[in-house]
Curated annotation (Swiss-Prot):
GO terms for molecular function: DNA binding; DNA-binding transcription factor activity; zinc ion binding. Keywords: DNA-binding, Germination, Metal-binding, Nucleus, Transcription, Transcription regulation, Zinc, Zinc-finger. It comes from the Eukaryota. This is Dof zinc finger protein DOF2.5. It holds the Pfam family Zn_ribbon_Dof. Residues 284-297 have a biased composition (Polar residues). Zn(2+) binds at residues 82, 85, 107, 110. GO terms for cellular component: nucleus. It is found in: Nucleus. Residues 120-149, 203-224, 284-304, 322-369 are annotated as: Disordered.
Length: 369
């Protein structure tokens, strides 16, 4: 190949000619082949114009470029307004788009997705911002601060007896639930002993005679001027005056329990001493059967008062029952004495009569007949 032909071919290549023209040499030997190979292939373009092979390749390249541009133009380059907040701070979702027919968009203002031709997602993506969290926590703390001021105090301070005395009489119309004084006995003999351990003395009729105490607090019951303790009510059987409306005798009356004879333990509660001594002259242990001597009956009588304690709380009913029993026993004893001729020196009588006369004698000594 000559140098001139080489330079011409290089210039033609620089002018970017079609491959068919570059591959075809200018000699006569290849002309018949070129005529057969260089058929004018007519191709219809998008515009409907038929072109030859030389122009078809250029048009096809241009069509490819226009197709890429058309695809890029199909994607929205401009920012759309959010259908919820109408803001332009939106973006097209390239990666999490599920279908090209309904492209997906995202609003950065309200943090919501929406699709073109679809519905708006109402739930925001992610959480709220940190600024909103701080504001919500501060509002909740303000609510907690305002709630205790509106609610009543469920734990009022405990008022002792020295604070109750300072109150006026008009303000002491409550139920007097704090009438158990704790540190009120500075004026009494025992400084550290509570007042409810010092019981008032009882009279025979069962009414309460209160101690002389400097107290201005009125009790629940109208007749008492000092605080009434629970132990005091149990002892007296709630036998207060009739105007108070309480006349119950479920506990022993004052004649059966005297404050001078009641023994108190260290805890302040009375020991169960003889609340109701029995009027019968025989013991319930059935000791000493058949012995009718006066010494034996006196020993049984003393033994009964030391050991046989009747601890029934129903004082008045037991008193009436015991008195009726002794009257019946005395009546039977008198009939037996009359039937036997009132023979007090007869020691050879039947053991049954001697037993009953010795046991049911009211004097305690008994008579042997």
């Amino acid at each position: 190949m000559d140098a001139t032909k080489w330079t011409q071919g290089f210039q033609e290549m620089m002018n970017v000619k079609p491959m068919e023209q570059i591959m075809i040499p200018n000699n006569n030997t290849h002309q018949p082949n070129t005529t057969s190979n260089a058929r004018p292939n007519t191709i219809l373009t998008s515009n409907g114009v038929s072109t030859a092979g030389a122009t078809v390749s250029g048009v096809s390249n241009n069509n490819n470029n226009t197709a890429v541009v058309a695809e890029r133009k199909a994607r929205p380059q401009e920012k759309l307004n959010c259908p919820r907040c109408n803001s332009t701070n939106t973006k097209f979702c390239y990666y999490n788009n599920y279908s090209l027919t309904q492209p997906r968009y995202f609003c950065k203002g309200c943090r919501r997705y929406w699709t073109e031709g679809g519905s708006l997602r109402n739930v925001p993506v992610g959480g709220s911002s940190r600024k909103n969290k701080r504001s919500s926590s501060s509002s909740s703390s303000n609510i907690l601060q305002t709630i205790p001021s509106s609610l009543p105090d469920l734990n009022p301070p405990i008022l002792f007896s020295n604070q109750i005395h300072n109150k006026s009489k008009g303000s002491s119309q409550d139920l007097n639930l704090l009438s158990f004084p704790v540190m009120q006995d500075q004026h009494h003999h025992h400084v550290h002993m509570s007042q409810f351990l010092q019981m008032p003395k009882m009279e025979g009729n069962g009414n309460i005679t209160h101690q002389q105490q400097p107290s201005s607090s009125s009790s629940v019951y109208g007749s008492s001027s000092s605080p009434v303790s629970a132990l005091e009510l149990l002892r007296t059987g709630v036998n207060v005056s009739s105007r108070s409306g309480i006349n119950s005798s479920f506990m022993p009356s004052g004649s059966m329990m005297d404050s001078n004879t009641v023994l108190y333990t260290s805890s302040g509660f009375p020991t169960m001493v003889d609340y109701k001594p029995s009027n019968l002259s025989f013991s319930t242990d059935h000791q000493g059967l058949g012995h009718n001597s006066n010494n034996r009956s006196e020993a049984l009588h003393s033994d009964h008062h030391q050991q046989g304690r009747v601890l029934f709380p129903f004082g008045d009913q037991m008193k009436e029952l015991s008195s009726s029993i002794t009257q019946e026993v005395d009546h039977d004893d008198n009939q037996q004495q009359k039937s036997h001729g009132n023979n007090n020196n007869n020691n050879n009588s039947s053991p049954n009569n001697g037993y009953w006369s010795g046991m049911f004698s009211t004097t305690g000594g008994g008579s042997s007949w």
